[in-house]
Amino acid sequence: MPALKGKITVITGGSTGIGLATAKRFVKEGAYVFITGRRQAELDKAVAEIGRNVTAVQGDVSNLDDLDRLYKEVETKKGKLDVLFANAGIVEPKPTAAVSPEHYDKTFDVNARGVFFAVQKALPLMKDGGSIILSGSGVWQKGIPMYPTYGGTKAALRSFVRTWTAEFAGKGIRANVISPGPIETPILEGQFGENTDAMKERFKTMIPMGRIGKPEEVASAAVFLASDESSYITGIDLPVDGGVVAV
């Protein structure tokens, strides 16, 4: 039987990269997926690629009205929610001395505040329990220069999940983090531009498995944490990074 048969799922940041790969896998495993993204053209393309059992809702996770509209759509169409993959996020490398208040606020608004309220507003639809998955990163564990704000937001997500593990257990809701390493996505390209190939080669020297990951490999981990196969797993941070944070 498909791992997610009949499950109603939401994937924020579901129009490209890890989010899109996960949406495709969720549908393949029997789920109905609501995906979000800021750009309607990318959402339309994603829906065409996914092909079935998908609804796209344009919006920005840092905008609480957009989150309300998302969950209203879920409630109207399906009446419940089984899985939330809070995947939307941004990354803009900057050294501490170059971080402006605007950069700081934007990064935390999307990566931390947006995730927090995406979860809060999902709870009324998880009446029968469910699985919450946050998209984290090993950056906060490794202490990598140029990522003080991004790493800070991902550390916040780890803290959220520790709290929610205890807070939501009585409601049958599990909460976990997936922490991807360097993955072949538009975000990776966007960080380094014309230096992307050189940075990929540098990353490979830091990764014990010696290669950049694929979005589909993160999607496989998300399927596991979304499914009943992980029914006794909550509160973890699952690295999908080729061994980066382990050594």
Annotate each predicted stretch with a short phrase.
Residues P124-L125, A166-G170, S231:
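Alpha-helical segment proximal to the catalytic Tyr-Lys
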Residues K142, V223, T234-V247:
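Short C-terminal tail/terminal secondary-structure segment
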Residues P95-T96, S100-F108, M199, F203:
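Substrate-binding pocket helix/loop in short-chain dehydrogenase/reductase
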Residues F85, A169, R174, I233-G235:
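Short, small/polar-rich loop/turn modules that mediate ligand/substrate recognition or access, typified
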Residues V119, T153, V161:
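Active-site helix of classical SDR
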Residues V99, G143-G152, T163, Q191:
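Active-site loop-to-helix junction immediately N-terminal to the catalytic Tyr of the SDR YXXXK motif
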